[in-house]
């Protein structure tokens, strides 16, 4: 049987116009993925033989967020077994902890921020280490939340926030989840678009996603940028309002990825391929229909995973949004897996 033609990646010509940030991310990911999968050579995912996974059991770190779902469901549904591996989801407390455990080998893979992997690879968010992005886990589905106290003063959106900051000058505090992560990017870009310098006109702090709502409740911050379900949780609890969604800022943006180290991929290429295939199948299963999404929400809401109520998860994965101030809408650009 003839071997399938391997995909090739075409790099931009040196004389071509400069890439914008979106094109650069897309092309960089495409080149990395093409190089990896082409190097594996085999079109099948796993067969009992020389391409069997070298490591049968893998630990995958995750943060309690809706977009950890593909990792969790690949394990819960037994999809991983189809590919000859056993996925063990490991609940982590912070993105810094995920970074450290990936780098030192305590975790084999992680549900992780796109920008965290690049930060480690470039040495801008800790010790430099070559990293690998196996696949994008989701697009869209993050948000910018302002406190209900600000909203009650007319600052439930960016325009109102600018007006309030001028009317009542003080140190305004906003939280994001990791310095080189997408949530920092959403927050800084959003503030700067209205003339608010995120480094000079406000105070930015880092708070792990599951702790955002609790910190807003006690008044430690005026707003935050985080993934779901914590934006919706703040609305349900009556302490926050949705000022913007990440898809408002950048439609269909890449968000979390399945990340690992380059060393792991080199040492266990078949395992890397099998794990990626299992999680990709789980992602497709989630997006396969309403019943699947409801089962997913019910599963990840449990204490072992996100530890929140199902209603904090299931509305926004279906695109059913409310802003906490009486506005509701159906968003076709909700989280996609």
For each feature predicted by the language model, list its residue ranges.
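N-terminal export signals
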Residues: 23-45
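N-terminal secretory signal peptides
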Residues: 1-23, 38
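Short gly/pro-enriched beta-turn/loop segments at secondary-structure junctions
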Residues: 252-253, 295
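Secondary-structure end/capping motifs
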Residues: 267-337
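Short glycine- and hydrophobic/aromatic-rich loop-to-beta-strand nucleating segment
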Residues: 144-145, 257-260, 264-265
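Short, glycine-/small- and polar/acidic-enriched structural segments
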Residues: 47-206, 215-252
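Solvent-exposed alpha-helix faces
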Residues: 29-30, 107, 221, 280-284
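Soluble non-cytosolic domains of exported or imported proteins
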Residues: 65, 93-96, 181-182, 210, ...
């Amino acid at each position: 049987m003839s071997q399938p033609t391997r995909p090739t990646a075409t790099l931009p010509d040196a004389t071509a116009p400069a890439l914008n940030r979106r094109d650069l991310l897309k092309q960089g990911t495409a080149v990395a993925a093409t190089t990896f999968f082409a190097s594996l050579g085999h079109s099948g995912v796993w067969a009992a033989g020389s391409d069997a996974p070298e490591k049968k059991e893998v630990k995958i770190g995750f943060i309690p967020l809706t977009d950890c779902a593909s990792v969790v469901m690949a394990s819960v549904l037994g999809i991983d077994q189809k590919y000859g591996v056993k996925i063990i989801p490991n609940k982590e407390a912070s993105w810094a902890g995920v970074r450290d455990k990936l780098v030192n080998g305590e975790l084999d893979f992680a549900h992780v921020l796109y920008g965290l992997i690049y930060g480690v690879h470039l040495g801008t968010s800790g010790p430099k280490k070559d990293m690998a992005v196996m696949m994008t886990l989701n697009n869209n589905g993050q948000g910018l939340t302002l406190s209900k106290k600000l909203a009650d003063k007319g600052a439930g959106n960016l325009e109102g926030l600018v007006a309030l900051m001028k009317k009542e000058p003080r140190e305004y505090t906003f939280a994001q989840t990791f310095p080189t992560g997408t949530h920092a990017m959403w927050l800084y870009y959003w503030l700067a678009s209205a003339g608010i310098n995120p480094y000079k006109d406000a105070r930015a702090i880092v708070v792990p996603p599951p702790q955002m709502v609790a910190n807003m409740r006690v008044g430690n911050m005026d707003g935050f940028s985080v993934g779901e379900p914590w934006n919706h949780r703040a609305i349900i609890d009556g302490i926050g309002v949705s000022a913007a969604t990440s898809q408002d800022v950048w439609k269909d943006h890449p968000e979390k990825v399945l990340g690992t180290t380059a060393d792991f991929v080199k040492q266990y290429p078949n395992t890397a391929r099998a794990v990626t295939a299992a999680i990709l199948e789980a992602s497709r299963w989630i997006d396969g229909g309403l019943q699947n999404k409801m089962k997913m929400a019910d599963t990840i809401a449990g204490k072992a995973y996100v530890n929140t109520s199902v209603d904090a998860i299931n509305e926004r994965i279906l695109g059913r949004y409310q802003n906490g101030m009486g506005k509701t809408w159906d968003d076709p650009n909700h989280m996609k897996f």
